[in-house]
Amino acid sequence: MEFCPKCKSLMIYQGDKLVCRKCGYEKEADDSEELVIKVERNKEDVPVIEGENLKTLPTTKAICPACGHNEAFWWLRQLRAADESEVRFFRCTKCGKTWREYD
């Protein structure tokens, strides 16, 4: 990792050069430097919504596909890529059936 000697910003590799995105300073990359990119993703625990936790969720008018009741708890969860919309989950306040709705 190298920082620009002019503006102290982080420099990035572009081909065989190091370039400062902020001020445009360029420097030949040293052959002895090896670029290693490591990406790690942490799996987050998905909270389970049940029992007393349900009573804290907002409710809305939605027809349950199982019993036809017209009220359900709802919550949003990001299941797909960050550039895609969230998934809306519903749980019937009467029978407990859970279903989802995509935008």
Swiss-Prot record:
It comes from the Archaea. Belongs to the archaeal RpoM/eukaryotic RPA12/RPB9/RPC11 RNA polymerase family. It comes from Archaeoglobus fulgidus (strain ATCC 49558 / DSM 4304 / JCM 9628 / NBRC 100126 / VC-16). Zn(2+) 2 binds at C64, C67, C92, C95. Zn(2+) 1 binds at C4, C7, C20, C23. Induces RNA cleavage activity in the RNA polymerase. In its presence, the cleavage activity of the RNA polymerase truncates the RNA back to position +15 in a stepwise manner by releasing mainly dinucleotides from the 3'-end of the nascent RNA. The truncated RNAs are able to continue elongation. Involved in transcriptional proofreading and fidelity. Misincorporation of nucleotides during elongation of transcription leads to arrested elongation complexes which are rescued by TFS-promoted removal of a dinucleotide from the 3'-end. This is Transcription factor S. A zinc finger (TFIIS-type) spans 60-100. The keyword Metal-binding applies. GO terms for cellular component: DNA-directed RNA polymerase complex. A zinc finger (C4-type) spans 4-23. Keywords: DNA-binding, DNA-directed RNA polymerase, Metal-binding, Transcription, Transcription regulation, Zinc, Zinc-finger. PROSITE patterns: RNA_POL_M_15KD, ZF_TFIIS_1, ZF_TFIIS_2. GO terms for molecular function: DNA binding; DNA-directed RNA polymerase activity; zinc ion binding. One of its GO terms (biological process) is DNA-templated transcription.
